[in-house]
Amino acid sequence: LDDRDLYVLVSQYGNEPLLIELAKYCKEKGHTLVAVINKKSYDVAQPLHESGKKLLDFADEYLDMSTEEPDIALHVGKYNVGQLSSTVSNVMAQMITAEVYNLYVSNGKEAPILLSANVKGADVHNNRLTDVYEGRVR
C-alpha cells in the first residue's frame, strides 16, 4: 500500500469477512476507501464478520450498482441466472477509469495509459510509464 493510494472495494452485499478485513486495514493505514455495492442487496445482508460490521462502516463514499435484489437477469425454468451486479460493476469500473483519464487531460496532464502491445510504438510509450511508476505497476 502506498500513502497516495485510494482504494475501491466492490461487493454486491458488502458483508464478506475477508472484504471487511481489507476495508479495516485500508482505514487503519489512513487510506480513502470507496465502496461499490448494490444498496438493495447490502440492506438485506447480515454481517458475516465477527465484528458485526459491513463495508459501509468503513467506506468514505459509496457507489450504488442499482441492480435489483435478488440479483438476477433471467429465470430459466426453476433457475435464476445472469447476475447483473458483475456486469454493472465492470461497466462502472471502466467508467471510473475513463473519468480519471478525462480529469488528467482536462487539467493539461498526460494520462498514464498503457497501450496495447499491438499498437506501433507501444513498447517505448509503456516503458516510459513503467519507469515513472516503477515498483507500483504489477
What are these regions (language model features)?
Residues 1-98:
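Glycine-rich phosphate-binding loops that contact phosphosugars or nucleotide phosphates
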Residues 102-138:
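Active-site phosphate/pyrophosphate-binding segments
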